Amino acid sequence: MIPVILSGGSGSRLWPLSRKQFPKQFLALTGEHTLFQQTLQRLVFEGMQEPIVVCNKDHRFIVNEQLAALNLETQAILMEPFGRNTAPAVALTAMKLVNEGNDGLMLVLPADHVIEDQKALQRALALATVTAERGEMVLFGVPANKPETGYGYIKSTADALLPEGVSRVSQFVEKPDEKRAKEFVEAGGYYWNSGMFLFRASRFLEELKKHDPDIYDTCLLTLERSVQDGDALEIDASTFACCPDNSIDYAVMEKTQRACVVPLSAGWSDVGCWSSLWEVNAKDAHGNVTKGDVVIQDSRNCMIHGNGKLVSVIGLDNIVVVETKDAMMIAHKDKVQGVKQMVATLNEQGRTETQNHLEVYRPWGSYDSVDMGGRFQVKRISVKPGACLSLQMHHHRAEHWIVVSGTAQVTCDENVFLLTENQSTYIPIASVHRLRNPGKIPLEIIEVQSGSYLGEDDIERFEDIYGRSNALEAGVKTQTIAR
């Protein structure tokens, strides 16, 4: 069995923690490990091959770092230049597998879900395997035991030709209103759509070609034009842009005669909004979930998330409060589905808080914006041992570097020299420069930028060991500067 982990989502409903450049799957929201890492861990058992990860190309190094932290490897990473929904992502993966002679069962699952009962998951997988080996296309359905309006529903019907415990899909239902959701629960035979699938690679491609040939043909051409970049396959952007944006459900599962449901009663949650995150976390005696420096008084059923500041709440009921260094979100727990629309509104206003946190992770380390004004910005930069920033130049700003700890190797035009703790240097405007950590411990520096323009797109890169381009880093103009 080949796990295919879909990790391309933006997780906008969990803003302000989840942001475009560091979405929810890479956050530790329900324990020590991130949702992506938890997904990886639950797939390590006999019969499972190393996973294939499909992610946005901007997240490649986050994926590699979180894999390395668990001492795990993938058999492939597919880097999408942008999202085109789940059907193209799975099609490209299936085509790659078939081309390599690996026509195995593909277990397709999102990177950002929670499954609490590992043994129940494995029992469901065993039943699904028997079914998929017969040529069926399995969807894992979570028995609908309460009227949820945030999930799509699947109506099932008995089929004597299927293994015991497996039923045929008779209808897909979009996210219902509360009245219809109650009717579904009372009627029985309805499941929440988990977004998890099991089918043979060639079977998926056969059904995709039959029911959505545009996606099939475009993905075939896209794969031919894609290039291998080290451990990852870089999906060709120009061809992929022509691919229809469609989900597995719409493209195949709603049209095929082979769709069936295997029940998944394993403590599943898609952690799709703040209320569902509240549900899966441990609560105090009054039903409150807290994280960070939080003090609660006379409050019940709240989700309070602090990130640096003391957060104190009094007399609240069913309220979500999320504090970060640069944004705060407060909502009634029944209204958190509106967070996605709030993010869209902020994007329309050109707000940068939806894109990055003040602390930004890069393959070489991270940087944190400490202070900023009209013509200056102060950043704390951390460079991992042996890592280096790109060789670059800025047209509108100068930089002052002060070493706080570790050793820095500095390139400034033709000069290369070392700086140690408490030493500093000046990088003039238009100087070609680079920062490297040649030591065994992290390098910490304070950078003071000054100039007429401090936008992220004021960067010209000449060399980069991580293969990044100016376009990758520039992306969105923000107040923080990519390196």
Curated annotation (Swiss-Prot):
Note accompanying the cofactor annotation: Co(2+) (for PMI).
| Single Gene Ontology MF annotation | GTP binding
Q: Is Nucleotidyltransferase given among the entry's keywords? A: yes
Q: Which pathway is this protein assigned to?
A: Nucleotide-sugar biosynthesis; GDP-alpha-D-mannose biosynthesis; GDP-alpha-D-mannose from alpha-D-mannose 1-phosphate (GTP route): step 1/1; Nucleotide-sugar biosynthesis; GDP-alpha-D-mannose biosynthesis; alpha-D-mannose 1-phosphate from D-fructose 6-phosphate: step 1/2
* Keyword Nucleotidyltransferase (UniProt): yes
What SUPFAM superfamilies does the record tag this protein with?
Nucleotide-diphospho-sugar transferases, RmlC-like cupins
Q: Which residue ranges does UniProt annotate as crossing the membrane?
A: none
List the EC numbers from the record: 5.3.1.8, 2.7.7.13
Q: Which UniProt keywords apply?
A: Alginate biosynthesis, Cobalt, GTP-binding, Isomerase, Multifunctional enzyme, Nucleotide-binding, Nucleotidyltransferase, Transferase
Please cite one Gene Ontology biological process associated with this protein: alginic acid biosynthetic process
Instruction: Show the catalytic activity.
Output: D-mannose 6-phosphate = D-fructose 6-phosphate; alpha-D-mannose 1-phosphate + GTP + H(+) = GDP-alpha-D-mannose + diphosphate
What Gene3D superfamilies has UniProt attached to this entry?
Jelly Rolls, Spore Coat Polysaccharide Biosynthesis Protein SpsA, Chain A
Taxonomic superkingdom: Bacteria
Which cofactors must be present for this protein to function? Co(2+)
Which PANTHER family would you find in this protein's record?
A: MANNOSE-1-PHOSPHATE GUANYLYLTRANSFERASE
As for family, the record states: Belongs to the mannose-6-phosphate isomerase type 2 family.
Q: Give the function comment from the record.
A: Produces a precursor for alginate polymerization. The alginate layer provides a protective barrier against host immune defenses and antibiotics.
The record's note on quaternary structure and interaction partners says: Monomer.
- This protein is called Alginate biosynthesis protein AlgA
| Species annotation | Pseudomonas syringae pv. tomato (strain ATCC BAA-871 / DC3000)
